[in-house]
Amino acid sequence: MDSNTITSFQVDCYLWHIRKLLSMRDMCDAPFDDRLRRDQKALKGRGSTLGLDLRVATMEGKKIVEDILKSETDENLKIAIASSPAPRYITDMSIEEISREWYMLMPRQKITGGLMVKMDQAIMDKRIILKANFSVLFDQLETLVSLRAFTEDGAIVAEISPIPSMPGHSTEDVKNAIGILIGGLEWNDNSIRASENIQRFAWGIRDENGRPPLPPKQKRYMARRVESEV
C-alpha cells in the first residue's frame, strides 16, 4: 500500500476530528455540519477499503499535523492562504431535505465516475426538480455533496451521491450522472427541471425550461431506445 495514501487518510481523519469538535461546540454553520456528515461516511468507506482503524489513524494524523505545525511560520501560512482560492458552498437543499430517508418501489442504480445514481422507475408523469448541494471553485462546480430529485409535493424520487470508497469526481462526471438520471426519469414521461444553481455552475448556462442538455453519449442512448420503441 502506498505510504502517501496512508498518510493522507490519517491526516484527513485528524482534521475531521477537529471539525467535529467545532460542531460540538456550536461554532459552525449548517453547510459545515452538512459536509461533516458526508465526510464521516467517506472516511468510514476509505478506512474499510484500506483496512485501517479510524481511531488509530486519527492519532497518527495528529502526530503528523503537530510535526508540520512546529516547523510552520506565520509568513508561510499567509502566503499559502493568499495563493489558494477558497471554494464557495452552494445549497439548493435544506438540512432536512438532504438528510431525509427515502425509498424506491422499483429501484434502479448505476455507478459512473465515482458517483452513485439511484432512481425510482415507478415514478411516472410527474413534474420533477433537481436540487443539489456542492462546492464551487472558479465559478464552476468542484465537488458534489448530494443531488436529489423532488416531485412537486416534495417526495424524493432520485439521487446522485459520491461513493465514499472511490476517488473524487470531476464536473464532467457530475454532468454525465445528471444525464443518466434525466434520461431514466424522462423515459417514464416525467418532466425534469434543474435548479438555476445546477444550470449555472455545472453547464454555465440557463435554459428557460430549466432542463440541462444531455451529454452526447446519453443522447445517442436515448435515441436508440426511441427507435427500438418505434
UniProtKB/Swiss-Prot annotation:
InterPro entries (UniProt xref): NS1, NS1A, NS1A_effect_dom-like_sf, uS15_NS1_RNA-bd_sf
Region (PABPN1-binding): 223-230
Signal peptide boundaries: none
Pfam families: Flu_NS1 (PF00600)
Keyword Ubl conjugation: yes
Top-level taxon: Viruses
Sequence motif: Nuclear localization signal, positions: 34-38
GO cellular component entries: host cell cytoplasm; host cell nucleus
Keywords: Eukaryotic host gene expression shutoff by virus, Host cytoplasm, Host gene expression shutoff by virus, Host mRNA suppression by virus, Host nucleus, Host-virus interaction, Inhibition of host innate immune response by virus, Inhibition of host interferon signaling pathway by virus, Inhibition of host PKR by virus, Inhibition of host pre-mRNA processing by virus, Inhibition of host RIG-I by virus, Inhibition of host RLR pathway by virus, Interferon antiviral system evasion, RNA-binding, Ubl conjugation, Viral immunoevasion
Location of the region described as RNA-binding and homodimerization in the Swiss-Prot/TrEMBL record: 1-73
Domain text: The dsRNA-binding region is required for suppression of RNA silencing.
Subunit structure: Homodimer. Interacts with host TRIM25 (via coiled coil); this interaction specifically inhibits TRIM25 multimerization and TRIM25-mediated RIGI CARD ubiquitination. Interacts with human EIF2AK2/PKR, CPSF4, IVNS1ABP and PABPN1.
Entry's family note: Belongs to the influenza A viruses NS1 family.
Listed name of the protein: Non-structural protein 1
Organism expressing this protein natively: Influenza A virus (strain A/Turkey/Bethlehem-Glilit/1492-B/1982 H1N1)
